[in-house]
Amino acid sequence: MPGVGFTEIHAENYMMAGGPALRFLDVVAERYPLSLHGVALSLGGEDPLDLDHLGRLKKLIDRFHPVSFSEHLAWSSHKGIFYNDLLPVVYDTATLTRVANHIATTQEILGMRLLLENPSTYVTFASSDWDEVDFLKETALRTGCGLLLDVNNVAVSAHNHGYSPADYIARFPHHLVGEIHIAGHDEQPEAVGSTVWIDGHGSPVSESVWNLLDQAIAMGGPRPVLLERDNAVPALEDLLPDLQRIAAALDAAEVDHAVAG
């Protein structure tokens, strides 16, 4: 399909022994580079890593040889109970040590570098003593992992917590970025005159997110950019204009960086 540079799947949707889903994925992987995106490792959780889950993930990686694997800075399991969500972590030294240890173990078992994604958040913790960007930088420094810059997550969190998304992008360590995500978000009314933004992946990408993508590419150079659409998915033909817009932004950055070099 013209305009499709690579595809990405949620790894947990394909952790079965066989069946049509894996056969279809074999066909996709023959045509396009494949990226795996995890949603359940619970890297920020206090529980030990689920080694059975990691084993299934390793089998998937060995079968499809993805160009990258990414996971979220979040937790989803506690005391053996799995919560079907990506929940926020406290940015303190204890969490940093725990996340770094979990990433190191994950990378050793999988035999590949992990890309850690900045989260979308809806609450903050008074006890946090690290800034999010600095926390991500330090985690990468300690583990050798890369980063996945989710531009929509930046926009969502910045709106919800009242800071500048452009300043966040400006401070981000772009040399560590292996992939960029963009997506749509939902705006839900809360108190009178206020809204909370939700990382919904079921609506078109907003102009504010497109502008942040342009900023990120200008600062860090071309990177693989994924258009995420998990809900209310339209026909592929309806998404092609967005893919063309991504390609144009990457092409312009190639020229700009060639001139600067």
Feature annotation, model-predicted:
Residues 50-147:
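Active-site acidic/histidine proton-transfer and metal-coordination neighborhood
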Residues 11-23, 42-52, 122-129, 155-162, ...:
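Acidic-and-aromatic substrate-binding clefts and catalytic sites of carbohydrate-active enzymes
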Residues 7, 69, 114, 150, ...:
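Conserved, mostly hydrophobic/aromatic
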